[in-house]
């Protein structure tokens, strides 16, 4: 594809794309450059003044341009590793920016209340207390933003085959990871404060999810193989073996979500001792569907819903136990990164989708639940976070070295 044709696809970044092609800069280098701009934006966002936010806005715009240019350059390559590398860098960029937005409140250089020229008018509105009071409330919003950032690409993977994922409506209109959400969020921070920035991020993220889901109900859409995207661990696979795929995945998952959602809404802090494990036990019902082929029209919902339940449980346990909020942020981010890495490798035939080393969604929930019930969360939480990020780094560097088609799901090959 010529530079002119590539640039015509995305006119705002056309000059950057042409320059990158002329200088033979690959998409991976553009993605790594975007991470540098993300770190710059995060650092300046944490400092808090209007001038600092202005610098962060410039960095966020540069981040948007480099991510978008890298994505356009990546259209020339059909290699799954390139696609995952672009997605991973974009996800990490969002994590850095969200952490920087919340870190300023922890460092007391940024107010948790609405600020800026528009923020004064928002005091006394729902935005002023959105997410909860004080520093913990802001970090809660950051964690929710991470959940949305991880779920948007997962929904795209579950709905579309590789050729159609990049052109899904949600990414065309509202931007994929690392795209338009970040500069818009920084503008909101500059005008109305950190909470307003997260509100904008969440609104755009939810809009992208809704648009992508609406795209799935168009005539001619057919389900794709999503069993390997669930992120099951050994325990889930073992439980699913007993029913051998005869139980549809949505029914037991719905029961688990109902119990988990109800208890989370009531507050895990109010559950004494071993009752903290009740949401985990309820979600284990979803394991009965781990061997099912997931060929139903609604079965694509199963992986995102399982992962959303895991994220909510990990976050709520951390906040209920008053763990250090950045640690809760890091653990949820590690779990989200893990799920996406496994899903991309499963789609490429480089992994079965069974998360043996990462414990799986159910293993992580069990470990955190037991730690919360026994009072050991202060040790387990950081240990699990460090382990997952080490595993993510290891698998990102060596997990893509296998041969395509080398891994199968146990339900397929026994």
Predicted regions and their residues:
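Membrane interfacial helix-start motif at the N-side
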Residues: 18-25
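A feature for the membrane-embedded catalytic helix bundles of lipid/isoprenoid biosynthetic enzymes
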Residues: 1-16, 87-414
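The first (N-terminal) embedded transmembrane alpha-helix
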Residues: 28-37, 249-257
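Functional transmembrane alpha-helices
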Residues: 27, 60, 90-93
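Membrane-embedded alpha-helical segments that form the functional core of polytopic membrane enzymes
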Residues: 29-80, 145, 199, 272-284, ...
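Membrane-interface alpha-helices at helix entry/exit sites of multi-pass transporters
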Residues: 80-88
